[in-house]
């Protein structure tokens, strides 16, 4: 247990930052899940919209050092590949 006033304050600050970081990380994760749901449903417009939001939120998490940049890059890359594959699949069906 902290004895110094500054240490007690830091415990409070850390709890607040942890909650904020958890919310931001959860928001990014939820957008990734929404993208996957749109992919499963085959809704291209929703996929593009959620991809942009997921990418933006992942980059924000990287800038605030909530997640590692390579983790965000990997998730964004995989979503982009799935979006492109879906696009190619739709074009093949149209032909």
From Swiss-Prot:
GO cellular component: small ribosomal subunit
Annotated GO biological process: translation
Key words, A-Z: Ribonucleoprotein, Ribosomal protein, RNA-binding, rRNA-binding
Pfam family, one: Ribosomal_S20p
GO MF annotations, alphabetized: small ribosomal subunit rRNA binding; structural constituent of ribosome
Record carries keyword Transcription: no
InterPro entries, sorted: Ribosomal_bS20, Ribosomal_bS20_sf
Chain ranges passing through the membrane: none
Function statement: Binds directly to 16S ribosomal RNA.
Record-stated family: Belongs to the bacterial ribosomal protein bS20 family.
Record protein name field: Small ribosomal subunit protein bS20
Taxonomic source organism: Ehrlichia chaffeensis (strain ATCC CRL-10679 / Arkansas)
Gene responsible for this protein: rpsT
């Amino acid at each position: 247990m902290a004895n110094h006033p500054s240490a007690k304050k830091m415990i409070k600050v850390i709890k607040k930052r942890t909650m904020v970081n958890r919310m931001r990380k959860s928001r990014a994760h939820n957008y990734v899940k929404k993208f996957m749901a749109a992919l499963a449903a085959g809704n291209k417009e929703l996929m593009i919209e959620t991809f942009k939001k997921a990418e933006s939120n992942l980059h924000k998490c990287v800038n605030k050092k909530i997640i590692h940049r390579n983790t965000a890059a990997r998730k964004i890359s995989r979503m982009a590949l799935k979006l492109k594959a879906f696009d190619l699949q739709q074009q093949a069906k149209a032909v």
